[in-house]
Structures are given as structure tokens and as C-alpha cells.
From Swiss-Prot:
InterPro entries: CBS_dom, CBS_dom_sf, FAD-bd_PCMH-like_sf, FAD-bd_PCMH_sub2, Integral_membrane_TerC, Ion_transp-like_CBS, Transptr-assoc_dom. Residues 311-370, 374-434 form the CBS domain. GO terms for cellular component: plasma membrane. It comes from Buchnera aphidicola subsp. Acyrthosiphon pisum (strain APS). PANTHER family: HEMOLYSIN-RELATED (PTHR22777), UPF0053 INNER MEMBRANE PROTEIN YOAE (PTHR22777:SF15). SUPFAM superfamilies: CBS-domain pair (SSF54631), FAD-binding/transporter-associated domain-like (SSF56176). GO terms for molecular function: flavin adenine dinucleotide binding. This is UPF0053 protein BU323. Belongs to the UPF0053 family.
Length: 521
């Protein structure tokens, strides 16, 4: 045992342990990939048995060192090639590794491994263990021959093999979990195994490929994959800072837009193909209609909208002024296609109450004072900063009535009905006395200045309009873009659209024509 006092013995032991770990990594990678085919509760067991058998096999082969040394003696020899027992084992192991790795790569590239865990068909436990043992035999032989070439003492070899296997056991679970969680790493590892299998075949046939080249290629690939994982980690970290609703909406809309972009290909399939199954598959691909995409987007983006973008603005509110005579009030109620009215004294900010048109008409016929009658139902007033999701609860409590939106100074900004919320989700439903906010013409859109930006953005299929929450209408956007109220005839460019001001007063923008620049499309 005095050789343990020799520093060169410890240096050789350390070097051999490192080499054994390096030579065992490919074995460890294959064990990790094979163990994924087993049920989760059997994977650790298979991994431990696989590495345990590798240790037993290597210790057994170490005890047969004198026989292993003779494995390099040719047993098949002719003028074209010569093969030893070692070469035959390496050749068999190389082809087996190439076959298994190719099958695994094919499965990954065809995406056949993504199945429901409840319905997934797992491989048999011992079938996986046998495959691990076969590869262990090949990798063990390579590791033992390396050990024999480096160290003369059998005890040192056994200690190095035991330590290397113990280190691999410690790292095996973490490596397995990492590989299984990162599918790009799995493909990278399978590519490494392809290279290793090819090198085993060429080595068996005496075509020498310097191991340094292989290690350099593997090291460079690992470096690139590290950069890839860092980039992905930073991307996920930046994405996590964004609102969850916004990320979910974008993901779902990307899916729907992807389906929408297939329509042209679907039509070609229907025209060119005479087969019933092709036509049937093309119909199944048309999953989402434009209206469905609009509504889903409206639901997903509702929470991120402001109350101002949902409400009917102050300028469009039809209200009853109690300072008018009864004949004027009666004519207003009969001519306006609304069933509910806010009743005010002189101006909209002086709200007395909310009445139904037919009930107020009956009260007027009975000579009942409009102010007295209207004060029975007081208005529900909400701030213009209220969250749209909380607004739904307020509308439920209103029991079919509307709610008044007011700013911090008590000035009425607009009103919201359940129909306004529905329009925010499904699009515009014009009243009998209204014209549509958006009229689509040949290659342009004629849009009212008060049109909600969210609805317009969905219709134009763009994300370039809403950059801030300071404005909710098209007019507000164009005024903010120009820095002042634009005049009729002016053109404002917001990529990829041109906004032609058709009609504007000194206070607001009334009508805009939108034209998309086809060169920017």
C-alpha cells in the first residue's frame, strides 16, 4: 500500500477519475434518454440499475485485465481489413448506438413523443434495462482500456472507476431532469450520440478520427446551446414582466391568425383535389371565422381597456331636460329610439334620476311633474378609472339600467349600458338613429372620429394604434399624433396607414378616411 504515498499515484488517480467521468457522460446521456420511456415512478430505479450494472461490469472487466489486453489481437485478417474482438464489440456497439439514436431522433423530429401522460404507452422496464446494459458493455470496454493504458495498479483502477460511477450517480438525476425539461438539449445530446456511434464504427474499422476533433465539436455545440438557453431564459424573464392577460391574448391570437393564414392554401386544396378526405381536412382547418376571432380578442383584452373606451361618450347621450315644456319632452321621447333616459335639470351634469320612456310618457299624460317622477330612481355613478371587470358587477346590480361615468370633478363623461360591454366584445350594434362608426369601402375605411381605438385596431388587424392610455378614440389618437387639432385635408401617417381628415370642427375630428399603404403591407 506504500504506492499511496507516491504523489504521482494521486495525480494518476485524479486524472483517471476525470477521464472515466468524461468517457461515461455519453453513457449517462443515453441512460437519461432511455429512462424517459419508463413511467415516472420507475425512472430513478432504471437509472440506478443501469449505472450500477455499468460499475459491476467495469470492475469485472478490470479483474480480467490480462485478457482485455489481448482483445487488440486480430482474429479476422485479410488484405482489406483486420478485426480484433475489441473491434467487433466496438463495431456492434457503434451500429447499435447509431440505430437507437436514429430512432430516437426520428421520434423527436416527428413529434410523436408528446402524448398525454395518462394515455402514453411506456416501454417495458427490463427492455429498457437490457438496452442500457448493452450500451454499458460498449462504453465500459472503452473506459477500461483507457484505464489499463494509464495506470498499472489494479486497485487504483478500481478506486477510479468506483469514484467516477459515484459522481455520475450524483449527477444523473439532475442531468436527466435537465435534459427532459429542455427538448433542444435532448436533440443536441442525440446528435452527440450519433457522432460517438459513428466514431466507434470508424475506430473498429481502423479509420482513425482524432478524439480531439470530436470533443472540440461537442464543446462548441455545448457553448452554442448555452447561449441559446441564456437567450431563452432572458426572453422568458422579460415575458414574465408583461401582464398575463396580454401574453395569453397574444398567444391565442397568434394561433387564430395562423389558422386564418391557411385559408388561401385551403382553397387551393379544395380546387385542385378531387378527394373527399382532402376536402374534409381542409374544412376542419378553417377553425376560426373573423367574427369569432374578433369576439375572442375582445374578451381577452377587455380587462386591459379603459372605461372611456367602452362608454357612450357625453356628446352622444340622449337626455331629458326638465326645463323644457312637456310637449318638447313628449316629442323627444317619441322620436328617440331609446327606452331609458337620464333626466337632468338644465344640463347633463345635474342628473335627477333615470326613467323609462314609456313610464315618463304616462306620467306626462297624467300631469305628473317630470322632475318629481324621475327622482324615484337615482342614477348609479362610477368613476372613469374603474376597472372594466368590476364594471360587470356594477351593471348586474343596475338590473338592466345604465350607469353614469363621471370624472374626479363630477363632470359626466358618458354612460355605459350592458350593450356597450357587448359591443366592446363583439363589435358595433348601431341604434336606429345612428350610422355605423366604420364604413368599409373599396380600399379604405371611412371612420368617425369618436370611434373606439380598440375596435378600430382589431378591424385593421394592427397593433400600432394603442401606445398609451391617454386617449380612447381615433380623434384623440390623431390629435396626440399631430400635437394640435388637425384641419380638413390634412394627412397623418401612422405606419402603415394614412389618415385623411375629411371633416373636423374647431373642437373635434368628425370623420376620417383611412388608407393602408400597400407597399408597407
Amino acid at each position: 500500500m506504500e504506492f499511496f504515498l507516491d504523489p504521482s499515484t494521486w495525480a494518476g488517480l485524479l486524472t483517471l477519475v476525470i477521464l472515466e467521468v468524461v468517457l461515461g457522460i455519453d453513457n449517462l446521456i443515453f441512460v437519461a434518454i432511455l429512462s424517459e420511456k419508463l413511467p415516472p415512478n420507475q425512472r430513478d430505479k432504471a437509472r440506478l440499475i443501469g449505472l450500477g450494472l455499468a460499475l459491476v461490469m467495469r470492475l469485472a472487466l478490470l479483474s480480467l485485465i490480462s485478457w482485455i489486453v489481448t482483445l487488440n489481437s486480430p482474429i479476422v485478417h485479410n488484405k482489406f481489413f483486420s478485426l480484433s474482438i475489441r473491434d467487433i464489440i466496438l463495431l456492434f456497439g457503434g451500429f447499435f448506438l447509431l440505430f437507437k439514436t436514429t430512432m430516437e431522433l426520428h421520434e423527436r423530429l416527428e413529434n410523436n413523443h408528446h402524448e398525454n401522460s395518462e394515455n402514453k404507452n411506456y416501454a417495458g422496464f427490463w427492455a429498457v434495462v437490457i438496452q442500457i446494459v448493452v450500451l454499458d458493455a460498449v462504453f465500459s470496454l472503452d473506459a477500461i482500456i483507457t484505464a489499463v493504458g494509464m495506470v498499472n495498479q489494479l486497485l487504483i483502477m478500481m478506486i477510479a472507476v468506483i469514484l467516477a460511477t459515484f459522481l455520475m450517480l450524483l449527477a444523473s438525476k439532475a442531468l436527466t431532469n435537465f435534459i427532459n425539461l429542455h427538448q433542444t438539449v435532448v436533440v443536441l445530446c442525440l446528435s452527440f450520440l450519433l457522432m460517438i456511434g459513428f466514431s466507434l464504427v470508424t475506430e473498429a474499422l481502423r479509420f482513425c478520427i482524432p478524439k480531439g476533433y470530436l470533443y472540440a465539436a461537442i464543446g462548441f455545440s455545448i457553448l452554442i446551446e448555452i447561449f441559446n438557453q441564456i437567450a431563452r431564459h432572458n426572453f422568458m424573464k422579460n415575458q414574465s414582466r408583461r401582464p398575463m392577460r396580454q401574453r395569453a391574448a397574444e398567444a391565442i391570437l397568434r394561433l387564430m391568425v395562423g389558422e386564418q393564414n391557411k385559408k388561401q392554401q385551403i382553397k387551393k386544396i379544395e380546387i385542385n383535389s378531387q378527394k373527399t378526405d382532402s376536402i374534409q381536412s381542409s374544412k376542419e382547418m378553417e377553425t376560426f371565422k373573423d367574427e369569432e376571432r374578433y369576439m375572442i380578442n375582445g374578451v381577452l383584452t377587455l380587462a386591459g381597456r379603459s372605461i372611456r373606451s367602452i362608454m357612450t361618450p357625453r356628446s352622444n347621450i340622449s337626455w331629458v331636460n326638465t326645463e323644457k315644456n312637456t310637449d318638447e319632452i313628449r316629442m323627444q321621447l317619441l322620436d328617440t329610439p331609446h327606452s331609458l333616459f337620464p333626466v337632468c335639470k338644465g344640463e347633463l351634469d345635474e342628473i335627477i334620476g333615470i326613467v323609462r320612456a314609456k313610464e315618463l310618457l304616462v306620467a306626462i299624460e297624467k300631469k305628473i311633474d317630470a322632475s318629481t317622477f324621475s327622482s324615484k330612481i337615482l342614477p348609479i355613478i362610477i368613476p372613469d378609472t374603474l376597472d372594466p371587470i368590476k364594471l360587470l358587477g356594477v351593471l348586474r346590480r343596475a338590473q338592466g339600467s345604465f350607469v353614469i361615468v363621471s370624472n374626479e370633478f363630477g363632470v359626466v363623461q358618458g354612460l355605459i349600458t350592458p350593450l356597450d360591454v357587448l359591443e366592446a366584445i363583439a363589435g358595433e350594434f348601431p341604434d336606429a338613429d345612428e350610422t355605423p362608426d366604420i364604413i368599409q369601402e373599396n380600399n379604405s375605411w371611412l371612420v368617425k372620429g369618436e370611434t373606439d381605438l380598440h375596435s378600430l385596431q382589431q378591424l385593421l388587424n394592427t397593433e400600432e394604434l394603442i401606445k398609451e392610455d391617454n386617449y380612447a378614440s381615433l380623434g384623440g389618437l390623431l390629435i396626440a399624433q399631430k400635437g394640435q387639432l388637425p384641419i380638413p385635408g390634412e394627412i397623418i401617417h401612422i405606419h402603415p396607414f394614412y389618415f385623411h381628415i375629411v371633416k373636423a370642427t374647431e373642437y373635434r375630428i368628425d370623420l376620417v378616411r383611412i388608407i393602408k399603404n400597400q407597399d408597407d403591407n
